[in-house]
Amino acid sequence: MCCILAGSREFVRKNPVATKRALRAILKANEICAADPERAVRALVDRGYARGQDTALQLMRELPYARWRDYDTEATVRFYALRLREAGMITSTPQRIIAGSTDWRFVNELKRELKG
């Protein structure tokens, strides 16, 4: 998985419905990018987020937007935390980061709700 969505503990605790809605919107946008990359690129170009339509379309087609359900998000965090620790950029272990800084319940619920 390439991307991470982060929210403060306090916000997520106080606003679980808003948190889940935001995550759902992002995941649905991923599905639009996968199902209709031309539409997604038009929106990016029209809003000035991308200049070259051909390059943006090629990129949109090559990125695995529809595969978010297939990724093991915990394994991804573990992998990158280990690399960051090996590089001396963090001191926490991957296990501590996962135990103290992750909450998979929204992703797991949406995997069930948003059937692919």
Description of each model-found segment:
Residues 1-2, 51:
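A glycine-rich, aromatic-flanked flexible loop/lid motif
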Residues 85-116:
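Conserved C-terminal helix/tail region of periplasmic/extracytoplasmic solute-binding proteins
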Residues 2-18:
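A bilobed periplasmic-binding-protein/Venus flytrap-type ligand-binding module shared by bacterial periplasmic
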Residues 14-91:
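Secondary-structure end/capping motifs
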Residues 9-12, 74-77, 109-116:
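Short, structured secondary-structure boundary patches
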